[in-house]
A protein has these predicted regions:
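STAS-like cytosolic regulatory interaction modules
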Residues: 1-103
């Protein structure tokens, strides 16, 4: 399940719950695309309630982020799932936020 929260005029937060697999990634990708078309430029992904992040889901999430970065957007995964292996993947490949966006 994916819920969105607008944090500012150009920043949106996606709350993802449940298992994160290829279908969830596709749903998230469509939501990100729609939000980008509406003018959002900064994207946060809260994965703290994800119960399972499989390899294909992680790959799809990285592709979503790469697409945002290639088109001038910024993104960050916050509170990754507790699995050590997945945390390492998320920390090394999914943390692409400009320094100006940090609090």
């Amino acid at each position: 399940m994916i819920q969105t929260e607008q944090l500012s005029q150009d920043t949106i937060l996606f709350h993802v719950r449940g298992p994160f697999h290829q279908n969830t990634a596709k749903e998230l990708g469509l939501s990100v695309f729609r939000s980008y078309r509406l003018g959002f430029k900064a994207f946060l992904f809260n994965l703290s309630h994800v119960s399972l992040l499989d390899g294909e889901g992680a790959r799809q999430l990285a592709l979503i982020g790469q697409g945002l970065q290639d088109n001038g957007g910024t993104w960050k995964v916050i509170q990754p799932p507790s699995s050590v292996g997945n945390q390492l993947i998320l920390r090394t490949s999914l943390q692409h936020f400009s320094q100006a966006m940090w609090n």
